[in-house]
């Protein structure tokens, strides 16, 4: 079995996670290939020996890899999708961060859950992604023009609101007068969109959510639409530029440039352990059903 390992940061709390992970992988004779920057961090902190193979980009991840393990929080998991892209390689998230909606494997369960993975006792949750196309070239994004959580437009260098003309399949929907607008996938519905009052979607829902950020037109509410909808946005404001973000990647775009957002032709395969389903994660992470009065 051949797997890739990816992470972004190292903290004191990460050390036991790395130790348990690599002990299990080595004991089971699994071929491990580590992302080179993460490997350098681990070697510097004496967490691993400098004997592992390394990879540097998505081009190195071919069909010989059975999965990629992301070590970190949800942000690290989202970054891992830029390495996997359309390869179909499943991602398993080990949580070394905080909430962990995507990185669902906790430290105390590393060996148990990885054993289930080795025994193929898991399911694949296929996650929708969004693609972005801009009328003018966005240098900061280049070929990473997709997002697993959300694509967001927001104001830049101003406290003034922006106006976002929104079209669905060519038909005018609304002009949002707000701090910004979130286009969220079902995966992203538990993130930024939820914080702005958007609904939670199950991962299997074939829908997207349009959620305004602090809208001044108070009757503008989050809207759930089919995920085969093509969305066009035209942003105007007092400043020359506004911001567009794809998960954690951000770029500056000129006013009046047309953004086209739609579902990508590929999905991300996320490994889901039976003990850590989406509904269980809702109960455990958002404390659904818990009554603190008792």
Curated annotation (Swiss-Prot):
Catalytic activities: NAD(+) + ATP = ADP + NADP(+) + H(+)
Location within or outside the cell: Cytoplasm
Major place of residence: cytoplasm
A GO cellular component entry from the record: cytoplasm
Residues the entry annotates as binding NAD(+): 74-75, 79, 149-150, 179, 190-195, 214
GO MF: ATP binding; metal ion binding; NAD binding; NAD+ kinase activity
Pfam families: NAD_kinase, NAD_kinase_C
Cofactor: a divalent metal cation
Enzyme class: transferase
Biological processes annotated in GO: NAD metabolic process; NADP biosynthetic process
UniProt keyword terms in alphabetical order: ATP-binding, Cytoplasm, Kinase, NAD, NADP, Nucleotide-binding, Transferase
This enzyme's EC code(s): 2.7.1.23
Active site: 74
Family: Belongs to the NAD kinase family.
Its job: Involved in the regulation of the intracellular balance of NAD and NADP, and is a key enzyme in the biosynthesis of NADP. Catalyzes specifically the phosphorylation on 2'-hydroxyl of the adenosine moiety of NAD to yield NADP.
Protein name: NAD kinase
Native organism taxonomy: Bacteria, Pseudomonadati, Bacteroidota, Flavobacteriia, Flavobacteriales
Gene that this polypeptide is encoded by: nadK
